[in-house]
Amino acid sequence: EPSRRQRQMCIRDSYYTTLFQQANTFSLGYNMNYDFIGQLRDYGVGFFGQYPFSKFSRFDFGATIRNVDYEIRQFDIFSFETSTNYKENLRAVVPLTSFVFDNSTNGYTGPVDGFKQYLTFQFSPDIGSNSIPFQTLKFDMRKYYKINRNYSLAARLMLGKSVGDKPQKFFLGGNSQMMIFSDTQTEGRDDSGFYAQRVLDYDNTSILEDVYFSEYVFPLRGARYRERVGENVAVANFEFRFPFVNYVDVSFPARIRFGNIFGHLFVDVGAAWDSSEEFDNSELVRNKYGLSDPKASPILTTFGIGTKIFTPFALIRIDTAWDKYPSGGYSKPQYIISFGYDW
C-alpha cells in the first residue's frame, strides 16, 4: 500500500494532452496584375506533465509534434483565377524539460514577495529534410522584495542561448500584449509600428522559423518587437511598484468614483546577438539593422514610469518610456498601452 507521501504526490502530479490547428491568411501586397496572399497553418499534438518535488518546486516536461505550412498564392485581378507560386513545410518534434522553483506571494497586480526560477531545455532533433534541428537553454529568475503592504521592489534576469543546424532566434523588444504603441524614435528619427522588422513579408525567406520556432523576449518597454534579434539573449528588468491613486470621489458635475490605480518605475536593459563580435564591432550591428550610429550596439536600455488600472475586462497598463542612445541622449517619450499582470 502506498505511503501517505506517495498518495499526496500522485494527487498532485498532473498530465494533459492538447490537439491544435491554427490557420492565418494575410495580404502580401499587390501589383498591376495580381494580389499576393500568404497562408500559414500550424497543426499537431502536445503531451505535457508536472512532477512536484515540494510545495515550491516541480519538474515540468513534455513534447510537441507539429507541422507548419506556408503558401503564397497569387490572385489574377482580371481572370479571377488563383494559383500557388510558393510552398514550404517544416516538421518538428520538440521535447522540453523545465525545473521550476516558486515561493512568491501575489498582491493585487502580481507578485510582491519571494523568488521565482525557471531553467528550461528544449530541442528539436533532425528528423529529415524538412526538420529544424536546434537545442535551446533558457534561465529566468525573479526576485521580489516587499517593503510594506503597498510598496515592493522587483528584479529579473533572463538568459537564453540556442545552437544547432537551425538555431532558434530570440526577438527582443516590446511588451506583452501591446494594444497601442505611439510613434517611436530610432537614433533620433521618428518611426512607427509595433515591429522594427516585419515578419509577414513577401521577401522573408525564414517566415516559418520566425513565426513558429522563435521566441519573443520582453519586457523592453520603449523598444519595438524585434528591435534586436539573435541566437543569444540577455535581459534584466528592475521595477519599483507603488500605489498611485487610492480613491477619488467626485460629486460635480457628475458623481464619479474610481481608485486602486497602481504605479511603477522601471528600467529595462537587454541584448540579443548572433556573434560576440557584435559587441566590439559596431559595423556588424549597423549592417544587421540598417543603423547609422557609429556606436550602434546589440544592447538596448529603456526606462520610464507607468500605471495599472483595473477594468471589468482586464488590468490595463499605461507606460511612458524613453530609449537611451548609444552615443548619448534620449528619445522622446513613447506611450504604450497593454494589458496583463506584473511579471
Task: Write out the residue ranges for each language-model feature.
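Membrane-spanning beta-strand positions in outer-membrane beta-barrel proteins
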Residues: 58-60, 152-154, 315-317
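Transmembrane beta-barrel architecture of outer-membrane proteins
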Residues: 6, 42-44, 92-96, 114, ...
